[in-house]
Every structure is written in C-alpha cells, then in structure tokens.
Amino acid sequence: MSSTGSVSPYDIIVCACGTQEYTARDAIDAAVFRGELQEKWRTFLHHVAAEERADELELELDESAISIAAEEFRYRHDLITAEETETWLANRGLTFDNFSEYFARQYCVSAVEEGVSPKEIEYTSADQELCEMFVAELILSGALDDMIVRLTWRLAARCAAKEPASEAIAAEKRKFLHRLGIEPTQVADWLEELGRDSQWLNEMLAIEAAYIGHCDSLLAPGARERELKALQLGLTRFEIELIELESHDAAKEALLCVREDGMSMEEVADEERYPYRHAEFFLEDLPADAQPKYVSVSQGNLLEPIPRGDGFELCRIIKKVEPRLEDPIVRSRIEQRLLERYFSELTTKYAHPRLSAPV
C-alpha cells in the first residue's frame, strides 16, 4: 500500500462537540464498542483476499471498468477536476494511490469468484498497513460517514441529557459484555488490544445510555402511529410481476396479449422467451416521477410499457399492501425517520461535522 502522506486517515478530525474534537479513529472505535465493525472488517478481508487471488492468477485488470467506477465516484461527490479530487482525498488523509488501489480492489472482488481465502485476522491485532488500508476503504465506500453520524448523534444526546442514572449505565455495560462475548475480568485485556482505557469505556457507556434514553422517549407508540399516517402512501408495498422486452412494439404486443387475449404475464414471457420475474418494493423507493404511474393503477392491472435501459418493461401490479406497524420493515423505516429528524436537529445544537486534517 502506498503511504497516505504525513497524516494518517485515522487522525483526521471528523466532528466536534463543545471544545472536544473527535477523529476517524474515535468514530471507528465507537463502532467497535457497539459491535458494528466486525462485519465490515470481514468484508474488507475478503476484498483483500480477492485482490491477492487476482495477483496469483495474473488477472489482467480491466482499466476501462476501473476508470468508469472512479469517474462515477467523482460524479457522485461533485469532484470535477483532478485538483478537487486531490483536495478531497488529502482532507481525509488519502492520496491518489489509495484512490486507485481501492477501485482496483473492488474490480478484483467482482472478477474473482473462486479460490478466495480471507485471512483470519482480528481488527485489533492487524498491522498498521492493513488497518490504514481498511480505513481508506471505509472512507471511500461511505461507511465511515455512517459511523460519524452515529457518533455525533450520541455525542449530542450526551450533551443534551442529564447525567445518566447508574442503572442505565449498568444496563449498557451488560449489553456491551454480551455483544463482545467476554467476562468482566476480560475487559482490561480487550481495552489494551484496542488501545483504549477504562475512562474511554466509561464515557462510551455514558454516551450510549444517554442515546438510548432519548430513543426510548422518542419512539413511543403514539409517535410511531403519527409518523405512519404521514408516510402512509410512501410505505405502501407493491408486489409486481414484470417482463423485460427489447422494444416498445414488443411491449405493446405483450400488453395486448394479456389484456385482450387473457394470457397471463408468465405465459407471454414463456411463449416469447422474455425474461420474467417478481419484485416487491415500497412506493417511496421509486423515483419521484415514476410513483404516480403506480398509484394510479389498480391492483391486478397493467402499467403502460416503461423504458428501461435499451429496452422496455411491462409491469402488472399483483398486490398493494397498506403499511402496518406490525411489519418489521415498515416499523424500522418509521423509527429511522423519527430518529433522523430528531437527532439532525439535536446535532446542530451540540455536535458539528468538522472534516479536516490535524494541524
């Protein structure tokens, strides 16, 4: 891995609360505390193993595909020039080499399907080079942004709340031990491996207790029900069947076969050998300009042919299901909306994003 320069990506300042500044390492270690890093670490090790396997196979990288992926990234982040990209990377402790290596590694993941054997390495015991490669992947994949948001929400909750009760902190300590699968006597060793101390752990427990206290107050049954009414249409679940066709004429012909001849969608697809599949989604998942088409069509009816890529899709609505709080996905989305709205406002008062390299 190429050097990231004089500033490690671990040391970039990502947010501040009061006079205290927090680094990328703080956000990552907080994710370790919450038990949210392990899956990302395992995925990263798989990516590294795929890259190593590609080297063993002497796989020729598709530079065009890698370049397209990098350009799409720059477009999403509004990085028009090379100078803007370099500044964006430098502010995060990264270089163009890190940038290029990341997209080459992602290509290897998609190109190598067999013979990939990730190493069994714990995050806390990995060497610095591997860890900094991991941080680069967290930054470029957007995963670090999510960790920063989760940290700032908790910092804001801590600042806005009274000192958590000892019972609440004790409850978080029990959850922490359960998440890690360790005994109280093993905590000191765990902290040493992470490079933290008991003061840090106590602060994490207090922050989490304050955050959970806010969440419990916010996610009362009445609040969920009010939010459900506001999101009734967007959280309507659609079950559809669709056929993929090569042209508008073919789509219109298939439409007539269903409407006029009484054939099923699957029969039309089988007869003409068109791809056929079922799909489920919430209305809010569709682009805004596509939503009215689905709202205006009754259950059991077909939509007019829809352009999709180089061809068209013919879609029939099998079922429309109104949202209910008993649906775990609906409930999760409602709770996430409530949390995002509340903590977005709270963080403007107490915690502030501050992405920069330390001076």
Predicted regions and their residues:
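Peptidyl-prolyl cis-trans isomerase
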Residues: M1-I12, Q20-V359
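Short aromatic-centered micro-motifs
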Residues: C15
